[in-house]
Amino acid sequence: MQSRNELPGSRRVIVKIGSALLTAGGKGLDQPAIGQWVQQIAELRQQGIQVVLVSSGSVAEGMSRLGWKTRPHRLNELQAAASVGQMGLVQTYESLFKRHGLQTAQILLTHDDLSNRERYLNSRSTILTLLELGVIPVINENDTVTTEEIRFGDNDTLGALVANAVEADLLIILTDQAGLFERNPSLDPSAPLVPQAGINDPRLNDMVGDSLSGLGRGGMITKLRAARLAARSGTATVIASGRESGVLPRILDGEELGTLLIPDVSPLIARKRWMAGQLKLKGCFVVDEGAARVLRDAGKSLLPIGVIAVEGEFRRGDLVACTDSAGQEIARGLTNYSAEEARLIMRQPSTRIEEILGYVDEPELIHRDNLVLS
């Protein structure tokens, strides 16, 4: 994506809404405001756009319910507030989306869920299945069980990692600012808004400041970091004011709202770089001529029936190569099954996986979305 003209072509979008927008000045959830974003998301769904909602607000809502005026610093108190507030947050979204005939699903994640390869695949598979079913996944950090070592730190980062996982076309971060400004607008009200920039533009570092609300964990600098993280998988980011009327449909229509941050690589190139440079090969599937031809010519998923040998020892989520019988690498990808499981189901049709293993994770050994040609 290189310009706003391409935004109307987005088919999968991550929308992140921060605490400062979701709460009514620290007095609990702002139901009317949340209702407006829910209505906008419903409009996007009517256009066939898949939407994942990453929502802050559980700690802020918990603080309100517990009568706390300032955000606590102790982790156990934050976790207690999150536990109390998450109830209200989920109930609110479920009720409001139901008015539009939409089902919601709650997903609470920790950093481990997206850094561990096996759990990453499980999380990704669940989210994609929900999207296929027309459900709106509502994702938040699992504050109740996280420790300092496994916290995302802010939901901007969580939104970016979810965008990476599901290969979203666009990450929209709604905030209490109109976007990125050339100078701090709190100090210089005449500072111009930056409508668009390349994600690696060195000037961006001088443009970010801190949010003033005190309810959330992330200032503008975390939003820029999140945009850069999303860009690693080729996802563009728009940072815009959540208080702008009809902001979500207007952004997807290509209107110049907020700041568009453009990735420097396409999603396919980004994924190839990631698999080539960040992951270590753990094994190999040797495939027959038919599977080799399908992989080379069509880039389709690798099915168990096309595998004639399994080399190495690996677990679900590891990177494995696909080679022909002569040892020529055709592709590489993330396996849905361990080496032990793969040896049991190779040469077999996918319909027999459950019969052989007693369960079925996926019908493919490697799904085409997790496969890149060599």
Swiss-Prot record:
SUPFAM superfamilies: Carbamate kinase-like (SSF53633), PUA domain-like (SSF88697). The keyword Nucleotide-binding applies. Substrate binds at S56, D143, N155. GO terms for molecular function: ATP binding; glutamate 5-kinase activity; RNA binding. One of its GO terms (cellular component) is cytosol. ATP binds at K16, T175, D176. It holds the Pfam family AA_kinase. InterPro entries: AceGlu_kinase-like_sf, Asp/Glu/Uridylate_kinase, G5K_ProB, Glu/AcGlu_kinase, Glu_5kinase, Glu_5kinase/COase_Synthase, Glutamate_5-kinase_CS, PUA. Its EC number is 2.7.2.11. Catalyzes the transfer of a phosphate group to glutamate to form L-glutamate 5-phosphate. Belongs to the glutamate 5-kinase family. This is Glutamate 5-kinase. It comes from Methylococcus capsulatus (strain ATCC 33009 / NCIMB 11132 / Bath). The gene is proB.
